[in-house]
């Protein structure tokens, strides 16, 4: 059935221009359907695109127009988000469920159409309703128009998509988390949909991802973390990497033997096959904070780098394993991200030195009483439900309309307000370890409420945001993803942000441009950007349980003074919520 489906579903590429020529149109058809997959002795029904896990790679050249027809054959509504694509003046195609559009109903179709402008590198796409992105995802590759890279041209590029294998129904998982149940865990990490040979059931060993290489050649590994819960360490035994890009932007080349990638991030690394021809294991390993934070199982997957000239049995020798950090040691992630800088080139945008609006956002957790109670026993009792917060506000998603529609129509009443708090209600020691586990002090600091509070900006405003992770209830890192924008990551640090001390650390010369900003565990991150893309843009943590719990808001960017700086009307293929 899947084979016949793939034969009838044409993934067409129309008028794709030759390198250096005119921009073309890249067209795909995504058929979203159910598929049974057996892992660890159990068969699970999952949702996939075109019979593939991960889904098809969208491969375009800078300047192309992308057209994707999505056919929904599953019993749930869904949208497709083009993670990291700027969507300049095409906010209607962003694909954020109930933010820019209502979901595509079962049995219906929708077309996404947008241009890829001034971006080169690795992004990705994924479902953006409930937990469906676990299996509905794929790489989105943007190649330079002139065919030239600011690093040695690889012989091949390979997506390395890190994910997780869930046996639990993903819609049920979403429902359970919204009800405050966070005891469910995936069974394994995956590399390109494969669990790897460290997983087995009744002696049946799971299949591993295999990367075949030729000695002396270089490979561009496009490492993407699609997981729900964890940052991942990625290593290949006997090999080193040169990090050259992240989130669709070039980086100053940085040599390392390990990559750390948080949920939502895409990291480009060059790997030269310069080891003695043999077989070498690759490992992805999830990290997590140590106790007293709540603990999760060890998520790991093992793949293989196989030299084509090597003996099939590796000359009878054991296959080398990379030495991985302790999973409870999160500092390698901090140092990896802190060592990255942007590559200066003629098209690299300059950091805004003047700031019009400053925002200070505390990322934390809070509790509210269940049901309609006004008072209840707090501190993780059965009377409360835990929520993720930004400045003590937990975001409430609309489920019958889309925020962009209401903004465009000028009818926000009863749906959202524009009073998102730009600073926390009270200052405190945000990274005090005594706040873990919860006690009486948290009850004073974390009063929380649910609301749909947005922030409005005028066009061409220079914005600075300090994201501060807190230790309220636990000490997670927070990968914050802003739709529609790349932001300058000026600095990251540990502890509570202190402006007098920490502003001296800001990198104004060659900061990274990122769409997903990892705010360190017990630390902070400072970003700046110019509001030059009108529309409704979702800001949220990319840990699935954090977004479901409410660590989100949306930014409204007003129109500029000209049609070229304004949000156009919905395109003909756009389906309004009342017509979905």
Curated annotation (Swiss-Prot):
Q: Its GO CC terms?
A: apoplast
Q: What Enzyme Commission number(s) appear in the record?
A: 1.10.3.2
List ligand-binding residues for Cu cation 2.
Answer: 83, 126, 542
- SUPFAM superfamilies, alphabetically? Cupredoxins
Extract the ranges annotated as region (Disordered).
560-580
Domain of life where this protein originates: Eukaryota
> Which intervals hold domain Plastocyanin-like?
31-147, 156-310, 419-561
Reaction(s) catalysed (UniProt annotation): 4 hydroquinone + O2 = 4 benzosemiquinone + 2 H2O
Signal peptide span: 1-23
Instruction: Recite the UniProt cofactor note for this protein.
Output: Binds 4 Cu cations per monomer.
Please give the Gene Ontology molecular function terms for this protein.
copper ion binding; hydroquinone:oxygen oxidoreductase activity
Q: Where in the cell is it found?
A: Secreted, Extracellular space, Apoplast
What is the required cofactor set for this protein?
A: Cu cation
Q: Which residues are glycosylated?
A: 36, 42, 115, 200, 339, 392, 429, 460
Instruction: Report the enzyme's class at the first EC level.
Output: oxidoreductase
Biological process terms from the Gene Ontology for this record are: lignin catabolic process
Q: What's this protein's function? A: Lignin degradation and detoxification of lignin-derived products.
| Protein known as | Laccase-20
Write down the species.
Oryza sativa subsp. indica (Rice)
The gene is: LAC20
């Amino acid at each position: 059935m899947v084979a016949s489906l793939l034969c009838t579903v044409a993934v067409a590429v129309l008028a794709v221009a030759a390198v250096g020529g005119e921009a073309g149109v890249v067209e795909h058809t995504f058929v979203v359907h159910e598929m049974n997959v057996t892992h660890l002795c159990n068969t699970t029904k999952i949702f996939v695109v075109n019979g593939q896990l991960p889904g098809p790679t969208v491969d375009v050249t800078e300047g192309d127009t992308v057209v994707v027809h999505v056919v929904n054959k599953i019993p749930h509504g869904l949208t497709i988000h083009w993670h990291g694509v700027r969507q300049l003046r095409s906010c209607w195609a962003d694909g954020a469920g109930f933010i820019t559009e209502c979901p595509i109903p079962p049995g219906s179709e929708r077309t996404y159409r947008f241009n890829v402008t001034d971006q080169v590198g690795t992004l990705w796409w994924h479902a953006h309703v409930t937990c469906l992105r676990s299996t509905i995802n794929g790489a989105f590759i943007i190649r330079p128009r002139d065919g030239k890279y600011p690093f040695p041209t690889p012989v091949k590029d390979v997506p390395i998509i890190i994910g997780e294998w869930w046996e639990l129904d993903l819609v049920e998982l979403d429902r359970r988390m919204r009800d405050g149940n966070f005891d469910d865990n995936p069974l394994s990490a995956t590399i390109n949909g494969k669990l790897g040979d460290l997983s087995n059931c009744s002696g049946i060993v799971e299949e591993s991802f295999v990367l075949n290489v030729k000695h002396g050649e270089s490979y561009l590994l496009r490492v993407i973390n699609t997981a729900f819960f964890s940052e991942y360490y990625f290593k290949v035994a006997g090999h080193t990497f040169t990090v050259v890009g992240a989130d669709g932007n070039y980086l100053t080349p940085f040599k390392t033997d390990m990559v750390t990638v948080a949920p939502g991030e895409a990291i480009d690394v060059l790997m030269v096959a310069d080891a003695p021809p043999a077989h070498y294991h690759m490992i992805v390993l999830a990290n997590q904070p140590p106790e007293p934070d709540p603990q999760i199982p060890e998520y790991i997957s093992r793949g293989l780098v196989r030299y084509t000239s090597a003996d099939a049995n590796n000359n009878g020798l054991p296959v080398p394993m990379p030495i991985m950090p302790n999973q409870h040691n999160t500092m390698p992630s901090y140092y990896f991200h802190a060592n990255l800088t942007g590559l200066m080139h003629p098209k690299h945008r300059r950091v805004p030195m003047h700031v019009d609006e400053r925002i200070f956002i505390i990322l934390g957790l809070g509790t509210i009483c269940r049901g309609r109670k006004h008072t209840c026993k707090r501190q993780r009792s059965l009377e409360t439900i835990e929520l993720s917060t930004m400045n003590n506000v937990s975001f409430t998603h609309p489920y019958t309309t889309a925020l962009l529609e209401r903004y465009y129509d000028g009818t926000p009443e009863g749906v959202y307000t524009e009073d998102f708090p730009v600073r926390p209600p009270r200052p405190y020691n945000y990274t005090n370890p005594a706040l873990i586990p919860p006690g009486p002090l948290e009850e004073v600091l974390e009063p929380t409420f649910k609301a749909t509070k947005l922030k409005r900006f005028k066009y061409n405003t220079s914005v600075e945001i300090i994201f501060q992770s807190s230790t309220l209830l636990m000490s997670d890192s927070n990968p914050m993803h802003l739709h529609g924008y790349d932001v300058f990551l000026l600095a990251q640090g540990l502890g509570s942000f202190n402006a007098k001390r920490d502003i001296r650390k800001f990198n104004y010369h060659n900061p990274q441009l990122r769409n997903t900003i990892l705010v360190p565990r017990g630390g902070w991150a400072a970003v700046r950007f110019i509001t030059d893309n009108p529309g409704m843009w979702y800001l949220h943590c990319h840990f699935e349980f954090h977004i479901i719990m409410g660590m989100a808001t949306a930014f409204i960017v007003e129109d500029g003074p000209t049609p070229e700086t304004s949000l156009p009307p919905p395109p003909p293929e756009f389906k309004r919520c009342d017509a979905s």
